[in-house]
Amino acid sequence: MEIEVKGHSGCQIDVINEKDGVFVYKSTADSKYLNRLALQAVKQQKAGAVEYQHIRVPRIYEVKQTDTQTIVKMQYVYSKNFIEFFEQAGFEQVEYLVGALKYFVEYEIGKSKLQTVSASVFQIKFSDIYKKVELNPLFVNNEDIKNILEKCKEVFSNMKDMNIPVGICHGDLTFSNILFNGNNYYLIDFLDSFIETPLQDIVKIRQDTAYRWSQL
């Protein structure tokens, strides 16, 4: 049995039934993403070495990287996606989820240190996003997007250096990157971030709860 799934990052995801079990293979042949996928696998391995309350991380079995392709072999988890979970969950199950995510983020904060981060780090990131949005044909004539970008531009241009916790984070902690297995929640698709801070995870999960960011 082999099932091919389209990944949100542009990676190919294959679910393959082998002699010793079912495994997930995540791969890319995109030269810009080869090293990133390998780094993300390492990040997932490190997170998987920690014991969290109700939070689990699929095991990474193998990472193969060549000049033309990166392939990551990992544990397959029988689970529900977030839509199936919330359709069937009662208040108790939702409370378990909230508690588990809270514990996970608090652990990250505890492993991080307050550091002064230069405003230029965020300004460079915003500049990169600004250029990508400008070049996106879907947004060229969208006045609302233009107004938002200009307001953001003003905010970032006046930004000062700030003290934030720097250390570890998932990088893309959204509901679409959580697999639901009973009262265990498997985090997938760890992302190497432009800055490793738990604030990334807080913002991402709030982005989901406030603006329904996740899509299947």
What is each PLM-predicted segment?
Residues A47, K80-I129, N141-M162:
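Conserved kinase catalytic-core helix
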Residues T66, I71-F91, K132-L138:
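A glycine-centered beta->alpha junction motif in the catalytic cores
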